[in-house]
């Protein structure tokens, strides 16, 4: 299972219970910003690749810094695109925020992009999220119970 994944499963529970959670948006691609934000008490940071110059290739590194500083990492993707959603989830994101979801079909497409068959369309590429294959079963359980899809 990815780095301390079992210690970072609070966000979905808190959101489901309408509890207060403290997070912020990350639009600057620099680890020092993440370190500063972690000392401010944030529980999660959302990497915004829709409205910033952060690229998909930066996401893996930023997720590692966010999680390494004890916070959960969400990624706001730039579109409801299964390939992009799969990439950020494979990079180890704790969840994804999908913009421009305007219909039930849009929502179903976003959720299917996060999940594996038979509930989704995500292909298996053993990467950071699944601890490079060692924790795939645990990751599937985590994905089902704790992944955040907004």
Region annotations inferred by a language model:
Residues 40-44, 90-95, 115-116:
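Glycine-enriched alpha-helix->loop->beta-strand junction motifs that scaffold or abut catalytic
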Residues 56-90, 112-119, 142-146:
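Alpha-helix-loop-beta-strand connector modules within alpha/beta enzyme cores
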Residues 26-40, 79-87:
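Short, acidic/polar
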Residues 20-26, 45-47, 73-77, 96-98, ...:
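Hydrophobic faces of well-ordered beta-strands that scaffold small-molecule active sites
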Residues 33-61:
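Glycine-rich, proline-tolerant flexible connector loops at the mouths of alpha/beta enzymes
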Residues 24, 37, 48, 88, ...:
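Conserved, mostly hydrophobic/aromatic
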Residues 1-23, 136-147:
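N-terminal amphipathic alpha-helix/helix-capping segment at the start of soluble metabolic enzymes
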Residues 83, 95-150:
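Conserved anion-binding
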């Amino acid at each position: 299972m990815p780095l301390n994944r079992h210690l970072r499963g609070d966000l979905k529970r808190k959101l489901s219970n309408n509890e207060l959670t403290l997070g912020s948006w990350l639009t600057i691609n620099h680890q020092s910003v993440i370190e500063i934000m972690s000392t401010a008490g944030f529980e999660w940071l959302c990497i915004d690749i829709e409205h910033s110059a952060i690229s998909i290739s930066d996401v893996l590194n930023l997720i590692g810094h966010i999680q390494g500083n004890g916070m959960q990492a969400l990624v706001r993707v730039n579109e409801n695109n299964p390939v992009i959603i799969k990439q950020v989830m494979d990079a180890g994101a704790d969840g994804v925020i999908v913009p421009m979801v305007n219909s039930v079909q849009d929502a179903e497409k976003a959720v299917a992009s996060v999940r594996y068959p038979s509930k989704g369309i995500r292909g298996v590429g053993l990467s950071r999220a699944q601890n490079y294959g060692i924790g795939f079963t645990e990751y599937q359980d985590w994905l089902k119970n704790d992944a955040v899809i907004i």
